[in-house]
From Swiss-Prot:
Gene name of the encoded protein: ubiG
Single annotated GO MF: 3-demethylubiquinol 3-O-methyltransferase activity
Pfam families noted in UniProt: Methyltransf_23
Protein name: Ubiquinone biosynthesis O-methyltransferase
Species of provenance: Xylella fastidiosa (strain Temecula1 / ATCC 700964)
Organism superkingdom: Bacteria
Catalysis: reaction(s): a 3-demethylubiquinol + S-adenosyl-L-methionine = a ubiquinol + S-adenosyl-L-homocysteine + H(+); a 3-(all-trans-polyprenyl)benzene-1,2-diol + S-adenosyl-L-methionine = a 2-methoxy-6-(all-trans-polyprenyl)phenol + S-adenosyl-L-homocysteine + H(+)
EC numbers: 2.1.1.222, 2.1.1.64
UniProt signal peptide: none
Pathway given in the UniProt record: Cofactor biosynthesis; ubiquinone biosynthesis
């Protein structure tokens, strides 16, 4: 019976790809348009590195954008494969890799296509600020589960579907403070932790942790918090070998 990950290369919205293609300018400028991502990146890296030994690990970065997290993971000694469907962002990532000397295997590829290649399974998979931008996020989670080694971990960051998230992540960030371009996020696509937990269970993964993540624009810094009503991080583990090899 075909499963959700058999829908190869169909799980995207062209409008989202076009939108992110327009975000390439200044991607690696910590004071530029992607300033919030630069502030979030150390928090994301620390969250991952406390749960996975990165030195020598095989890591997949799904929806890698211009490579901020990909390079940070590689600097910790991980062997990183990074995929995105926006050619302009992969070009940015590759060019920066040439400048930095950090080796990452960047690919213009959907995770469903990568899964179809049946690569060696990964020790860890990162899917950061990506699930809220695809029409079928549960299928992404399912594909990630099938690409993990037994005992491998999936790391997700996304935005909760709450009034607080709408007011701060959409109205505040896009229209008041203008930290992000208008239209970056759609409230209806935000994901409640309970929804993510259900997708993880269905994919055969065990949810280990959910932690809130808060960006403070007045200080341009981010931190973990007990509150998950806006941004949050989650970690899930694959307990069965079948999920990495089927």
């Amino acid at each position: 019976m075909p499963s959700s990950y058999d829908r190869v290369s169909k799980n995207y919205r062209q409008s989202e790809l076009d939108k992110f293609a327009s975000f390439t300018s200044g991607w690696w400028d910590p004071h530029g348009p992607q300033k919030p991502l630069h502030a979030l990146n150390p928090v994301r890296l620390d969250y991952i590195s406390k749960r996975v030994s990165l030195s020598g690990a095989r890591v997949l970065d799904v929806g890698c954008g211009g490579g901020l997290l990909s390079e940070a993971l590689a600097r910790q000694g991980a062997h990183v494969t990074a995929i995105d469907l926006v050619p302009e962002l992969i070009k940015v990532a590759r060019l920066h890799g040439l400048e930095s000397g950090i080796q990452v295997d960047y690919r213009i590829q959907a995770i469903e296509d990568l899964l179809a290649e049946q690569p060696a399974p990964f020790d860890a998979i990162a899917c950061m600020e990506m699930l809220e931008h695809v029409p079928d996020p549960a299928a992404i989670v399912d594909a990630c589960a099938h690409l993990l080694k037994p005992g491998g971990r999936l790391f997700v960051s996304t935005i909760n579907r709450t009034l607080a998230a709408f007011m701060l992540a959409v109205v505040g960030a896009e229209y008041v403070v203008r930290l992000l371009p208008k239209g970056t996020h759609q409230y209806k696509d935000f994901i409640r932790p309970a929804e993510l937990a259900a997708w993880l269970r269905h994919a055969g993964l065990h949810l280990e942790d959910v932690s809130g993540m808060r960006y403070e624009p007045w200080r341009n810094r981010a931190r973990l918090t007990a509150r998950t009503d806006i941004n949050y991080l989650a970690c899930a583990i694959s307990p069965e070998a079948s999920h990495a090899t089927e």
